[in-house]
Amino acid sequence: MSRYRGPRFKKIRRLGALPGLTSKRPRAGSDLRNQSRSGKKSQYRIRLEEKQKLRFHYGLTERQLLKYVRIAGKAKGSTGQVLLQLLEMRLDNTLFRLGMALTIPQARQLVNHGHILVNGRIVDIPSYRCKPRDIITVKDEQNSRTLVQNLLDSSAPEELPKHLTLHTFQYEGLVNQIIDRKCVGLKINELLVVEYYSRQT
């Protein structure tokens, strides 16, 4: 299944706020109206919608998300929390959380087009897994820095999650540590996502 490229407002009206997909927010009460029209949700639909929320927020294909679920299932600790850590530590999401892009698809374009360096080397793979002490910088070329500066100027000022530090004037971000669960930038019940996939096998 390919990455979603359709109307974004349609998705947030059904699933709620997806800051990684779009900065738009659903109108107050739209979730309640949708639920009243469709009646009581089944447990399957609740799990499916949480899975879809995760997939659309991080801009993943179904196959990519399933791969992350399997990796998380083999790791030590809570599968749901490990899954969120894996997704949050992706390079495209890290750029988004630093404020260097307004959405994750926008961050992915910056990476794909070679504007971003990690530890002094160009990394053009959006799924690159950032690690503590990684230094993320914008390529030292005018078009790259102008592009990112415009995005930084356009992004609403938000408190950075504790695992990241941004040095705006150097166009540099630092990964301090693996992200804590409470700093994840999406309202999600990750256990329902794990349950969804466990019932598919």
Curated annotation (Swiss-Prot):
User: What are its GO biological-process terms?
Assistant: ribosomal small subunit biogenesis; translation
**Ranges where the record places region Disordered:** 20-44
- Annotated S4 RNA-binding domain residues: 89-152
Q: Which InterPro entries match?
A: Ribosomal_uS4, Ribosomal_uS4_bac-type, Ribosomal_uS4_CS, Ribosomal_uS4_N, S4_RNA-bd, S4_RNA-bd_sf
A molecular function (GO) held by this record is: rRNA binding
Pfam families from the UniProt entry = Ribosomal_S4, S4
Task: Give the PROSITE patterns listed for this entry.
Answer: RIBOSOMAL_S4, S4
Which terms are listed as keywords in the entry? Chloroplast, Plastid, Ribonucleoprotein, Ribosomal protein, RNA-binding, rRNA-binding
Subcellular localization, per the record? Plastid, Chloroplast
Q: Does the keyword Phosphoprotein apply?
A: no
The keyword Flavoprotein is assigned to this record? no
Q: Which GO terms describe its cellular component?
A: chloroplast; small ribosomal subunit
- In terms of superkingdom, the source organism counts as Eukaryota
The UniProt family comment states: Belongs to the universal ribosomal protein uS4 family.
Q: Fetch the PANTHER family from UniProt.
A: 30S 40S RIBOSOMAL PROTEIN (PTHR11831), SMALL RIBOSOMAL SUBUNIT PROTEIN US4M (PTHR11831:SF4)
General function of this protein: One of the primary rRNA binding proteins, it binds directly to 16S rRNA where it nucleates assembly of the body of the 30S subunit.
Describe its partners and assembly state.
Answer: Part of the 30S ribosomal subunit. Contacts protein S5. The interaction surface between S4 and S5 is involved in control of translational fidelity.
Protein name (record):
Small ribosomal subunit protein uS4c
Q: Which organism is it from?
A: Aethionema grandiflorum
